[in-house]
Amino acid sequence: MARKIVITSGKGGVGKTTIAVRLGLCLAARGDRVVLADADVGLNNADVICGVENSVQFDLSDVIEGRCRAMQALVRHPESANFFILASGSPSRLISPQAMRLVLDGLAPRFDYVLIDSPAGIGSGFHRAAACAEEALVVTTPHISSLREADKVTDVLRSYRLKKGELVVNMVRGDLVVDGEILSPREIADILKIPLAGILPQEDGVFLGESTGARRG
């Protein structure tokens, strides 16, 4: 039976979906069968990031509304034979947590991992995704605004009593950590009271000015 992991964040623009895709590719590369379910209904972009948007014939909405079976809606990632994407689509009615869980539970026996890309924040879409998961990865950046929202997410996740919750700190600039301009990933994990699973560096050399507020208040 698959491990069901929700990848979430308190704030948009922190790289959550990109990290979900990269995680899926890494797991698939070691031989695991992985499906990434885009739970950001109506604002889905996991298929775009994976480069399969033109290959999507059916999506999560179609499965829930009975137009196809779950396996028919999966699109294979072009870089891996073991990694599949389930796009969310735009449903004609509100998708309930129970309906989404039914779909993902149906897929779980065929896969080693079910990754659930949650909408940012703690709205209804977040709760729908969290209700389907057994584990969570919270993605944040060192920006103070991102940390504040990640704190809200971790607080709410505790109410779900998941088996495991871990943190990924994205867009980290080591020079600013060394200079004391921003909190280190370890300090961030301690503040949020959640184990640190991974650190990803800032790739483009651009770091928003608000980041320097993370340590100074």
Q: Can you annotate each of these PLM segments?
A:
Residues 2-39, 107:
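Walker A/P-loop phosphate-binding motif and the immediately C-terminal alpha-helix
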Residues 39-109, 204-216:
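P-loop/Walker-type NTP enzyme "switch/lid" segment
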Residues 41-43, 91, 121, 143-145, ...:
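Conserved nucleotide-binding/hydrolysis micro-motifs of P-loop NTPases
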Residues 108-125:
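Glycine-rich phosphate-binding loop used to anchor ATP phosphates in small-molecule kinases
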Residues 123-144:
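Inter-motif core of Ras-like GTPase G domains
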Residues 147-163:
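Conserved C-terminal guanine-recognition region of P-loop GTPase G domains, centered on the G4
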Residues 159-217:
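C-terminal lobe/tail of nucleotide-utilizing enzymes
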